[in-house]
Amino acid sequence: MRNAKLYSFSLPMEAGVVLRYQRLKTRDGFLVCLEQNGKQGWGEISPLPEFSHETLEQAQDAAQSWLAAWCLGENPTDSELPSVAFGISCALAELEGTLPEEANYRAAPLCNGDPDDLILSLNEMSGEKVAKVKVGLYEAVRDGIVVNLLLEAIPDLKLRLDANRSWTPAKAEGFAKYVNPQWRDRIAFLEEPCKTPEESLAFSQATGINIAWDETVRDEGFEVKAQEGVTAIVIKPTLVGSLARCQSIVEQAHALGLEAIISSSIESSFGLTQLARVAQWLTPDSIPGLDTVDLIKQQLIRCWPDVDIPLITLEQLKTVWQQ
């Protein structure tokens, strides 16, 4: 006997979270619960505004169709909507016991504002010092100055930068001018500096700054391949698709000597704890990009360790579908 439920959630965001051109006030999504033979499996379905192609309503419709078929004893193929495919594949993996419990909670701290705050937190960090800075939100020259300041202040720091395809080649060049050439090799990678992969590759070859693919992974026809200047593949499962799809990309990246990074799409604490398990399972030697729990004012059912943020329980969620 198979049963399934779909719960909806809407969690308030901290002020100032902007995705491309939209301020995000709440993080909305669904939790899916599968039940069979006295066991349960859970997953989160939360398309990310401005980044996911599917809307919340489309995700709900697709999830309900998949769940209805599953409850009738069918084994439907993965949804074509990445957020649905990922959430349901996590629920199936929990149900079948194939998603290991061990999690990788190491995080690359995210610098959202004052670089001095990041310097303080990194000075307290033991072991490998890795941090992430979003660039492309302000002037490219300012970004270059901030990155240079961080690399100068902390000699053993490795920086991950993310530009979200924000820059023209001229702006990317303006950024690089302000980063001391002798420190550029401590930029672990810069995700998607320019609007096209071709421009990003040219930027890397001109500046010696390593790059990583993120949005490109989700382009139609994407293939993992060795390219000069590309050192990493960033995988955001909510935007990429099922666990099997993510695992395939990780294995292809590792086979070519590229680093694979499991990264957040601002999921709830519930989704983040699952991503930490996925990261430990598929990329145990890499620090995942999951330092987003404090962007949301409430945690959801499962807590991120050592975080003092109020918790929403299952009883507080609305059931939107069950069978």
From Swiss-Prot:
It catalyses: (1R,6R)-6-hydroxy-2-succinyl-cyclohexa-2,4-diene-1-carboxylate = 2-succinylbenzoate + H2O. Its cofactor is a divalent metal cation. One of its GO terms (biological process) is menaquinone biosynthetic process. It is an enzyme of class 4 (lyase). It comes from the Bacteria. Converts 2-succinyl-6-hydroxy-2,4-cyclohexadiene-1-carboxylate (SHCHC) to 2-succinylbenzoate (OSB). Signal peptide: none annotated. This is o-succinylbenzoate synthase. GO terms for molecular function: magnesium ion binding; O-succinylbenzoate synthase activity. Keywords: Lyase, Magnesium, Menaquinone biosynthesis, Metal-binding. The keyword Oxidoreductase does not apply. The active site is at 134 (proton donor), 236 (proton acceptor). InterPro entries: Enolase-like_C_sf, Enolase-like_N, Enolase_C-like, Mandelate_racemase_C, OSB_synthase_MenC1, OSBS_N. Belongs to the mandelate racemase/muconate lactonizing enzyme family. MenC type 1 subfamily. The gene is menC. It comes from Proteus mirabilis (strain HI4320). Its EC number is 4.2.1.113. The keyword Lyase applies.
